[in-house]
């Protein structure tokens, strides 16, 4: 990110130096809260299977530190973001399968950072979304890819009523779900204190990394 005029020449030269075409593209910085949205598309319908607040820190490097569901954004802005996502999916010609968006709500309204024909990576589609909605969207995506109807999704989803290029539905969040990343400092982890006590907290759903940490620290 170029923060002021003094960084412009250096940044452009660095970009060109590392470009095969020896060109660079300058794009507007989109300022505003960011969201991750997952959806499944088939038979003229688009079902939102997850909508999470995305937590980005440490500019100008923009490190993703986690997600939280359900979102805190207002319903009107929520609908605007979903409609923009649906228009992007339509423009890309995605008619069957998964779609995901990283999208911001700026002073000019929704602005798309990315739309991809896949589910969210990391822990999102496998853990964070299902923990919030009690819905296995990975299974539903596979069913659609195999030409089958995602019956569980059809039972859980509810229709959204606003103008969009698809018949819109959503699978709503039932519980709060969040995942967070830890940024380490230089050095070697020798011990972790209080881990056993924290893991007995009823609000902790998954502890894979905690088990791994105990193994590492015991070596």
Residue ranges with predicted function:
Residues 15-23, 28-71, 79-112, 116-125, ...:
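Phosphate-binding core of ATP-grasp and ATP-grasp-like enzymes
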